[in-house]
């Protein structure tokens, strides 16, 4: 498994996106240290805001980092 994973939630609803990210976090093995969530930004900030708010205090997430573009958010994972 890669140490870095990418998840594209562009065309998802907020509920679908949260479900997909939660599943990705559950599947993330010991070698995964970062999940890049691609939420986009041209269609609004609902997904971006939901990702950043929900996962800022998630037990598996060490910190949130801004991605390389405004349409990405990186979840840096804790070593559990």
Regions found by a protein language model. Name each.
Residues 1-80:
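Long, charged, low-complexity intrinsically disordered regions
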């Amino acid at each position: 498994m890669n140490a870095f994973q990418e998840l594209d939630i562009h065309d998802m609803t907020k509920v679908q996106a949260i479900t997909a990210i939660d599943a990705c976090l559950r599947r993330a093995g010991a070698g995964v240290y970062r999940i890049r969530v691609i939420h986009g930004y041209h269609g609004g900030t609902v997904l971006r805001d939901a990702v950043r708010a929900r996962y800022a205090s998630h037990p598996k997430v060490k910190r949130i980092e801004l991605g390389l573009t405004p349409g990405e958010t990186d979840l840096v994972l804790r070593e559990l």
